[in-house]
UniProtKB/Swiss-Prot annotation:
Gene Ontology cellular component list: cytoplasm; membrane; neuron projection; plasma membrane; presynapse; SNARE complex; synaptobrevin 2-SNAP-25-syntaxin-1a-complexin I complex
Record InterPro entries: SNAP-25_dom (IPR000928), SNAP-25_N_SNARE_chord (IPR039077), T_SNARE_dom (IPR000727)
t-SNARE coiled-coil homology domain ranges (all copies): 19-81, 137-199
Lineage: Eukaryota, Metazoa, Chordata, Craniata, Vertebrata
Subcellular location(s) of the protein: Synapse, Synaptosome; Cell membrane
Name assigned to this protein: Synaptosomal-associated protein 25-B
Provenance organism: Danio rerio (Zebrafish)
Feature: compositional bias, Basic and acidic residues: 1-11
GO biological process: clustering of voltage-gated sodium channels; exocytosis; locomotory behavior; synaptic vesicle fusion to presynaptic active zone membrane; synaptic vesicle priming
Predominant location category: other
Length: 203
């Protein structure tokens, strides 16, 4: 009888330990799911901010392009005014930056999404679950569902990271263009001011 009682107690202890491990494992998958969902939300916010920043850079580049067009008109007017005043005309194409033609930017919204790659986690889900079933109870069902969601979100995070990298590369190239345009516009404005000052002084 004592042996049976000891065995029963041992089995109860093993069952209690198994239940404890099951509860801890379930809680672990819940924490994992919460963490990747928070990461996904942060990724979405970052993509939105990058998109807004891209729109601002687009407006800045359009403004620089408009200044370029306005300067061409101003340089033409200064040349015409110089001719009327009997001054030696200075062709616009001799001005620094005057011959530069700016068109539509070469960078735009990423037109293609990265190819979807089926990794080991997704392959496990396709082949029948993320965990090896022991008790086949509701806890294991939830653990499997949680891990499936974690795997899916991690795949989305990978794609987000690729999109972020592409967008940042695009914006870096756009910033370089804007800097070049700003330098060119400043040079042309300075030279136009010098010409105008010379005309006024000669008058």
């Amino acid at each position: 009888m004592a042996d049976e009682s000891d065995m029963r107690n041992e089995l109860n202890d093993m069952q209690a330990r198994a239940d404890q491990l099951g509860d801890e494992s379930l809680e672990s998958t819940r924490r994992m799911l919460q963490l990747v969902e928070e990461s996904k939300d942060a990724g979405i916010r970052t993509l939105v901010m990058l998109d807004e920043q891209g729109e601002q850079l687009e407006r800045i580049e359009e403004g620089m392009d408009q200044i370029n067009k306005d300067m061409k008109e101003a340089e033409k007017n200064l040349t015409d005014l110089g001719n009327l005043c009997g001054l030696c005309p200075c062709p616009c194409n001799k001005l620094k930056g005057g011959g530069q033609s700016w068109g539509n930017n070469q960078d735009g919204v990423v037109s293609s999404q990265p190819a979807r790659v089926v990794d080991e986690r997704e392959q496990m889900a396709i082949s029948g679950g993320f965990i090896r079933r022991v008790t086949n109870d509701a806890r294991e069902n939830e653990m499997d569902e949680n891990l499936e969601q974690v795997g899916s979100i991690i795949g989305n995070l990978r794609h987000m990271a690729l999109d972020m990298g592409n967008e940042i590369d695009t914006q870096n190239r756009q910033i370089d263009r804007i800097m070049d345009m700003a330098d060119s516009n400043k040079t042309r404005i300075d030279e136009a001011n010098q010409r105008a000052t010379k005309m006024l002084g000669s008058g």
